[in-house]
Amino acid sequence: MTDATPDYKDTVNLPQTTFEMRANAATREPQLQAFWAQHKIYETLQQTNPGEVFILHDGPPYANGALHIGHALNKILKDIINKYQLLRGRKVHYRPGWDCHGLPIELKVLQNLKPEQRAQLTPLTLRQQAKEFALKTVAEQKQSFQRYGVWGDWAHPYLTLTPDYEAAQIGVFGEMVLRGYIYRGLKPVHWSPSSKTALAEAELEYPEGHTSRSLYAAFEVIELPQGLAKAWYNALGKLGVAIWTTTPWTIPANLAVSVNPDLTYALVEVQPSERYKHLIVAKDLVERLSDTLGRTLKVVATAKGADLEHSRYRHPLFEREGKILIGGDYVTTESGTGLVHTAPGHGLEDYGVGQRYGLPILSPVDENGCFTAEAGPFAGLNVLQEGNAAVIAALQECGALLKEEPYVHKYPYDWRTKKPTIFRATEQWFASVEGFRDAALRAIAEVKWIPAQGENRITAMVAERSDWCISRQRSWGVPIPVFYDKETGEPLLTAETIAHVQAIIRDRGSDAWWELSVAELLPESLRDQADRYEKGTDTMDVWFDSGSSWAAVLGDQQADLYLEGSDQHRGWFQSSLLTRVAVKGQAPYKAVLTHGFVLDEQGRKMSKSLGNVTDPREVIEGGKNQKQDPPYGADVLRLWVSSVDYANDVPIGKNILRQLADVYRKIRNTARFLLGNLHDFEPEQDMIPYAQLPALDRYMLHRLHEVFSEVTAAFDSFQFYRFFQTIQNLCVVDLSNFYLDIAKDRLYISAATGDRRRSCQTVLAIALQNLARAIAPVLPHLAEDIWQHLPFKTPYLSVFQSGWVQLSAQWQDNALAAEWQRLRQLRLEVNKVLEKARAEKLIGSSLEAKVWLYVADSEWRDRLAQMNPRDALSGNGVDELRYLFLVSQVELMPQPQAVDVPYVLEAEGLWIGVGHAQGEKCVRCWNYSESVGQSALHPQLCDRCQAALQGEF
């Protein structure tokens, strides 16, 4: 450039902003979190927002280790909802909680002790160490949750181990006692020999591939009821009732055989026969059993199950008799023989039959899972190992065994020790669900379940569930505040005793139960009888702990929302429902939202052995190899949460995170462009009124109204993936690829304060502020970063104080939108031809091109003619085809192929030609124009740029 050539660089309005192109999340996100904390943004909004209170009640995670990706999904979903509600002006109350008692924490403590330390362990020292472990874990997890950008009352979380919480829980228990819902009874429960404790349903898992030794056996029938055909009585002497079981070890506890009253049973002749010449089996199973047993079974006579009731048989291993009794719908012909071996001490259905017929509850198995003396020759043997084998051998020896075979099925395991459980009758404390089941089912129907199928799931579970065993034989938990008479074993549990213990626990915590004497724990009126009583040693099921959280946190209020994984239909949702309905007669929640589990990119469960675990900390901070696993920051993790359909199981992995980081960058770069081009814009004085805006800008406001209305609907319906898709589409398709692409010419080369530029800045300012608000629930750090870089003043310190998106009804213009959709479609067609010309090097930039255009529709042609003024200065400088297509010139043709050009696209009613633009290139705007060279003062500029320098374009 010679001295004589003017430099127009300083006359161009280039973007200016200190907003970084890169997020630098590792440093920037903690700075923004410190800003929120310093200015108490959450605390202030929680109190000063004008709207109603919104309570999302936190399901307490278990305080026994580092957080996994499922925790991140859960807590971020909650935070998205809470932040949206804050932006909508509601007073959000969110008090995070932790589940701090129970066996997993006990096990962690025990694992860290040497054998001699374990031998000397008292309940109080174990409890002290368990408490220390839980509190340390809570502190670590709290830090992680806060790093995710999750807001809440972190200074006052609820912990199930604090005295006020434990006292509230004792209060719930006491209310249930007084209403007659708590009882003590001998009943089969899921018993874990490996943990030596009873387990609730929620503490079981059913791994694939468990193989049991199943067997078919026959018990000798010695008496039949009257009214059967003669053939039945003729068979006595060598007649067996055939049963099938997958738990041979329960045969010593057999007291009955159950039939279905409505099924047809057959008396079959066995060929070849050994001990039994005849067997009783379900008629529909004769053929299948013939194959299984390897014998011919010939039907001799039939009878209904109801007709076999009260038949008597001899136990094959013990000197006692049993009866054929009526069972329930669980007796089917799907497997086995159609007759069910019944041991009331070892199964819930068996227990139900036993209760109906007044059978004793025989359970000859101790807490270690070994046979007791009641099992005679099997005493001392482990029922799941050598005890099982010994029973099978004994049945073989006495001729009762018909067949043994391996059986693969789902079997309950202890979720903590990963060892099999058994059903075993023990003295336990129960909540009688029967007493309030109907009320619970009515309460379920009044709740909004998201997704809707959650209602069917929990309804079926509550309708079918048995009474809830709430006692545990562990030290680390809330004590069941019961005293037992030393002589009679009678429990002492009254309103007075419970209230007294509750007051002590509120004051001193539950350690007091172990620290204080019986005399100190009894109320004044009973103190002189202290020698008669001893303290109970059972603690409450941890599901009763967390299920009482409504009492400790909500009091009489109902939460607006509970939100947890879909496994909580049988866990926390249910335990909370049952305790609240029992005490208050209503559900603790108005709505319940569930999410699926997190899988890897191939849809597999995560496991260390597969090496497919995504650690949320690594997503945020990066892995050991930061090139391979870069630090994406919390916002990218949160963007992932918004992108998945959480109603199902959701995938995550390196490829997914890379794609999300790319989407995040696009949103960030869009915001950076908007910020940079508003550096000299003051909304109060520079905004152009809606009526004076060019059509393109009014169309863009229509699109913003559509987009942000869709985002609002997405948040209102908890469909965050719709937010993700809509915002991504706005930033990429509507803004970057369309509006901002066209806007650069207006923003950079127009007169700085001219309407052509200010009208565009008006749209940018509206888009930017609403974009920041709309992404704030999901991308709070990015939204706040944008807000802190706004080049103009607003009344709000933080984006979260600015409220939700602000839209005007007048922006909606469907006719205008329809026209611009058609124009955008035309632009896409023109771009196809421009791409062809660019690929073959006719042009570099599209500004080097001229477009020739023919449309057959005469009305449309007239409209396009209005958008194609004769010269650069006679239109409005915005709503023109040359700007829409990003070319230097457009010529409308009276007919197709009226000009010979190198690049053409022909379609129905449409012809597009592209050639090189006419005239010279303007050094300032890079458009080609025949006006370049005509000005003596600015010979290198086009007429537009000359006018812009005069402040007229």
Swiss-Prot record:
EC identifiers of the protein: 6.1.1.5
Catalytic activity: tRNA(Ile) + L-isoleucine + ATP = L-isoleucyl-tRNA(Ile) + AMP + diphosphate
Cofactor note (record): Binds 1 zinc ion per subunit.
Cofactor(s) the protein needs: Zn(2+)
Residue numbers binding Zn(2+): 922, 925, 942, 945
Subcellular location(s) per record: Cytoplasm
Name this polypeptide is given: Isoleucine--tRNA ligase
